[in-house]
Structure formats: structure tokens, C-alpha cells
Amino acid sequence: MTKVVCALSGGGAKTAAHLGAVRALRETGLVPAHYVGTSMGAIIAAVLAAGCSLEEARRLLSDLRLRDLAAPAPSALLGYFSRGLFRPGPFRRAVARLVPARRFADLEVALTITAVDTETGELALFGTGGRDDVPLVDALYAACALPVYYPPAEIDGRRYVDGGVRAVLPLDTAARFAPDVVFAVDVGPSWRELPADGTTRVPPLVRQSGQVQRILMAAYAEEMLGRWAARPVNADPELILVQPPVRAETTFRLDLVGAYEADGYRTAAQVLAERGARRDMP
């Protein structure tokens, strides 16, 4: 049986595209044996690894509201001394509602979550291949604790932030688990993003911080994808890369979840059809 490891990028609400992409993958008969997720992609990965159907996952995601993910922190009034713009409590409660599992041991499919240790700068893994004794909601908060927006997660005396700080698309992590195929869905910051449409009001300081993070994340992703593209033809593991269209400044556009999912399905179906055509060539 072909071992498929799904690498799901960060990207906020845009990660709804992962649901559509995984649906297209399953329609080909390939079944994910392992999910590796970064940032909000880690939450989507956890929902699927817990055994939720794609329909249930879509419903859970559609029920999210902005106040669940971005509840303003009173401490933001402290200016320079604030730990983050948003309160972690509402976010953690939203994650607990989304993911019907409390421990990694409760999951039906292997799951690996990435975060970054703020002291060492190293990528930290939770779940398969890393620490699996941490409550799932703690690991998921760590994976999503994007600097400026949320305070770092504190786990056993260590502080962790969003895994996207090191690798918004966890391709290299997925490759650690001896897959035959890495099915990677990328909706994170990149140079291919369409410009913001101007409908989202973003405070200047937040926009500047987001632009810097986008540059750093996009540069790392470009370097990593370049390394993978430079591999010999037919190198193992096979990479199936799905990159749905994305637009800047839509991280919190929960009203577009349905459109993102449709984009993920359409793009993945096309990529998979092209893969099938290549494999059928003499």
C-alpha cells in the first residue's frame, strides 16, 4: 500500500483549502496515513486525524467566528508591554470545540504538529516523532502562537511560537516518516499571493508586522521548494504539491471558508489528474 503523508501549511482561514485538497486525494484512492501540520494547518490536520469526516470538518470550520480566534486582549492597551493582540483563552476553547480528541493517543491517524522553541530557534515536534505526552490543545496552541498576535505557549518551562516561523509548509518534517508520497498543500505566505483587495481593514503596525513575517516565511518556503525541485527525477519520496490561489491579508476571512475549500479541491483535482496522465504515459 502506498504510504501517503500529508503536509498541511499554515495560512489562517485559507487552510480550509486543505479539506478540499484531501477530498480530491481520497477520490483517487489514496488515503493519508499521517498528517503533518503547521499553524492553522495543524488544527485541520488534527481534526482529520481525529477521524472527523470532511463534511463534519467543514461544518466545524464554518461555525467558527472571528471572536473565537481573534478576541482582543485588554493588555493590548499597554502598548509595548503587551504580550499579544489577542487573548489565548478564546482561541484555545475554539480549538477544543473543533478537535474531538484531547490526547495524541486518542487520534485515529498519526499526527505531527510543528512549533518553534523561542530560546533555541529550533523546530519542535509534538505527536508522532516528537513529544506525545502534551495535551493536544496545548500543542495546537503552540503551533498557532504567531508572534504579535498571540502570547507564546508555555509547556514545561519552554516557550513556543507558531511553527510557520521556521517552516510554514512542513515538507521536510513530512519526509522524515518514510513516505512513498508527500501530499503537500500550500496556502501560506508566498510570492505568488494576489494583492490584498482592500476590503479588510488592518492597523498599520499589524500590517507592517505581517509584511515582515510574510517575507521571511515566503523566502524560507521558496528555498525549501527549490531544494525539492532540484532532486533527481523519480526521487523518493514523490512530491505532489498543491498550491491553490491565495490573496494577501485574508488570514482571518472566515467568511471565505467555502471558497477556500472549493479552490483546494479544484487545484488538487487538476494536479492529481496531471499526475495520473504522466503515470499513464508509455
Q: Model-derived features: where do they sit?
A:
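Helix-rich "cap/lid" substructures immediately adjacent to catalytic or cofactor-binding pockets
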Residues: 1-35
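Non-catalytic peripheral regions of patatin-like phospholipases
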Residues: 2-4, 54-94, 116-118, 122-123, ...
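Catalytic nucleophile loop
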Residues: 9, 32-50
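Conserved small-residue
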Residues: 11, 21, 41, 113, ...
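A short alpha-helix-loop-beta-strand transition element characteristic
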Residues: 99-112
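Short beta-strand scaffold segments in enzyme catalytic cores
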Residues: 111-117, 151
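ATP/pyrophosphate-binding catalytic subdomain of soluble kinases
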Residues: 135-173
